[in-house]
Amino acid sequence: SNNDMNILLSYLIIIPAIFFYNILSSINYGWKPHVVHYGAVVLEGSKIPILLVTLVWFELGVFGVIIAITIAHIPGILLHLIYAKQKIKDKINFKFTKKWLKLSWLPGYNSLSTIIMSLDVLIFTIITGSVIGLAFHGAAWLVARLSYNAAIISNAVYPKLLEAKVAGNIIQKNITLLSFIAIPLTLISMFFAKPGLYALNPIYEGASVVIIFMTIRCCIYVYSSAFAQYLTGNEKVDVSENTTFKQYIRSKLFLVPSTRLIQYSGFLITLTLVLMMVFESSTYVELVTYWSIIWALSEVPFLIYFYILVKKNFTFKLEISNLTKYLLIGIISFGVPYFLSPEFLEFNP
């Protein structure tokens, strides 16, 4: 209908706002990574009052949501612009346009693995013919992804590596700090999986085992993504203006997304085969459990691979003793409340 077409066309007004916001955010990420999170807070905080105005006051419906999201980007753009102005004070040199166009495939290739990864939901839905399993998966994912927040700690290393600073000591400290955040968040998700699901909805309580495997995967991914950032941040192939296409193909800027692409493709193939074999004889919770196990196992070899590459490129030493003690203390700290919780919590259907 004409109304639907007008709504689709109105989405075009969001594109410039998102475009400029992401560009300025990327500039700040290279030298002031904390500003990226300031911008996110400003962006999300601006959406709420503007949505109230467009939806409640003016009653604009879907078009009001589009306008609100567009306007909400403006404060975030201004914030990023204030911090980024030191880096964009020179005039735009159009001689770099050819190089930008030549290398425009690289960011797209980097995001291809993420697109491939999202197909697991589609595969599960097609094979099972239902979205019931997705409900259990989504509920478990809300609890399991808590440890993802630890990945923010590694963001500050990337700009330091771009500045060509001595990286070994920086990486060693970053891995330690990353562990200090990731370990407790992981243990919280695992030990309190059942209460977390019960709080969302009692019918999801049976998927608590799913959270354990999802949490393991999230924890592994936090480390593998940090290692990937170390590798790409240390790559200098894009510093020279005369870098050839072949040099980019051989660089870590191409290696890391290619490795992820292989990983996710293998994961999807394995998931498809397993679901086709066990679908008729399994419940939805069991199917989601298989899904989470395959997801976790697919991350392990690539964590090892990225770690080997990091060890080859940097000199650092893991603080195994301190991290082991920290892990044991965390297990005791969260394990005791877990075993005592049945005395104080009742899980009624």
What are the roles of these predicted feature ranges?
Residues 29-30, 145-168, 174-177, 228-239:
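Helix-loop junctions and terminal segments of transmembrane helices
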Residues 101, 158, 162, 166-191, ...:
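Interfacial transmembrane-helix starts/ends
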Residues 9, 34-38, 62-68, 78-118, ...:
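Interhelical loop/hinge segments that connect adjacent transmembrane helices in multipass membrane
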Residues 16-39, 163, 216-262, 268, ...:
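Membrane-interface junctions at transmembrane-helix termini in multi-pass inner-membrane proteins
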Residues 5, 62-63, 99-103, 121-144, ...:
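Interfacial/gating helices of multi-pass transporter permease domains
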Residues 38-86, 138, 144, 258-273, ...:
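Hydrophobic alpha-helical transmembrane segments
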Residues 43, 113-114, 290-295, 321-349:
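Transmembrane alpha-helical segments of multi-pass transport proteins
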Residues 1-11, 190-222, 237-238, 242-248, ...:
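Interfacial segments at transmembrane-helix termini and the short loops linking adjacent helices
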